Swiss-Prot record:
A single GO molecular function term of this UniProt record: protein serine/threonine/tyrosine kinase activity
Family assignment from sequence similarity: Belongs to the HPrK/P family.
Enzyme class: transferase
Ranges where the record places region Important for the catalytic mechanism of both phosphorylation and dephosphorylation: 202-211
Catalytic activity field: [HPr protein]-L-serine + ATP = [HPr protein]-O-phospho-L-serine + ADP + H(+); [HPr protein]-O-phospho-L-serine + phosphate + H(+) = [HPr protein]-L-serine + diphosphate
Active site (UniProt): 139, 160, 178, 244
Extra information: Both phosphorylation and phosphorolysis are carried out by the same active site and suggest a common mechanism for both reactions.
Organism: Streptococcus pneumoniae (strain ATCC BAA-255 / R6)
The protein's name: HPr kinase/phosphorylase
Gene Ontology cellular component list: cytosol
Alphabetized UniProt keyword annotations: ATP-binding, Carbohydrate metabolism, Kinase, Magnesium, Metal-binding, Multifunctional enzyme, Nucleotide-binding, Serine/threonine-protein kinase, Transferase
Entry keyword DNA damage: no
């Protein structure tokens, strides 16, 4: 099971620590959902989920402050359980003394942020969703080409890494080589990242392992990217028919999310990196409503119709 440490959330969202011993910052977060304890403030704890991060905004804070001191303390004692990872107070609101007392007794980290509650909630949920999502490892090279995540796959030894290196030289960015960890960020979006041990590295047969960031600079690498298009490289076969018009739509499905996939035949003399660049730009054009295949079909249909009229 994937997990995130409280200290990682603090670093990512730039939270301030009001109370938190070092061991409390090592607590694991295993659930991406967060809770804004509203009814719990009134003493209703049915269906309460203490294993989530508890986020307090202006409404929760205002109600808490309106309570008598002893009632405030008792409610917070019920909320703060050993399995609670942390409590975050948004908008830079002042943490009441009763909350600090309950946190010390129950060993719960208290954190604050100056961000608005809705913004903080969105950032926190997005971060936890991506960190805790189940990963699927695939073999290939993930590149950021013109801002698009392109996954290059193919048989071993066909030249995926070499193509990736050529794309880096052409100004694009390497995300991952050899092993790409992919997860579904939501129901329609795939995201990819490198294995930590392979970050910024690319292996070229006959040369060895290359540190792309050291050789080409920080602009040549990217830590993660959305995966929008898959390209499969395969050896050219004269007995096999390859798609010439772009009508044969293929898909690659990972973690229940499908993305378009194209097959590119590889043979001597073909500049594969340029072909992949064109494929990425063509995909983006289709997303914007410009479909060259459809335009060709329309022109061909119009030409046939004119010829039929002339020959009638």
């Amino acid at each position: 099971m994937m997990s995130v440490l409280v200290k990682e959330v603090i670093e990512k969202l730039r939270l301030d620590i009001v109370y938190g011993e070092p061991e409390l910052l090592e607590k694991e977060i295993n659930i991406a959902d967060i809770t804004r304890p509203g009814l719990e403030m009134t003493g209703y704890f049915d269906y309460y989920t203490p294993e989530r991060i508890q986020l307090l905004g202006m409404k929760e804070w205002s109600y808490l402050i309106s309570m008598p001191s002893n009632s405030r303390y008792e409610v917070l004692k019920k909320m703060f359980l050993p399995e609670t990872p942390a409590v975050i107070v948004a908008r830079g609101l002042v943490v009441p003394e009763e909350m600090l007392k309950a946190a010390r007794e129950c060993k719960i980290a208290i954190l604050t942020s100056r961000a608005a509650t809705s913004r903080l909630s969105g950032e926190l949920s997005s971060y936890l969703d991506s960190r805790l999502a189940e990963r699927t490892s695939v073999h290939g090279v993930l590149m950021d080409i013109y801002g698009m995540g392109v996954l290059i796959q193919g048989d071993s030894g066909i030249g995926k890494s070499e193509t990736g290196l050529e794309l880096v030289k052409r100004g694009h960015r390497l995300v991952a080589d050899d092993r790409v960890d992919i997860f579904a960020k939501d129901e329609i979006t795939l995201w990819g990242e490198p294995a930590e041990i392979l970050k910024h590295l690319i292996e070229i047969r006959g040369v060895g392992i290359i540190d792309v960031m050291s050789l080409y600079g920080a602009s040549a690498v990217k830590d993660s990217s959305q995966v929008q298009l898959a390209v499969y490289l395969e050896n050219y076969d004269t007995h096999k028919t390859f798609d010439r018009l772009g009508n044969n739509a293929e898909e690659l499905e990972v973690s229940g999310v499908a993305i378009p996939r194209i097959r590119i035949p590889v043979k001597t003399g073909r500049n594969i990196s340029v072909v992949i660049e064109a494929a990425a730009m063509n995909y983006r054009a289709k997303e914007m409503g410009f479909d060259a295949t459809r335009l060709f079909d329309e022109r061909l249909t119009s030409l046939i119709a004119r010829n039929e009229v002339q020959n009638a």
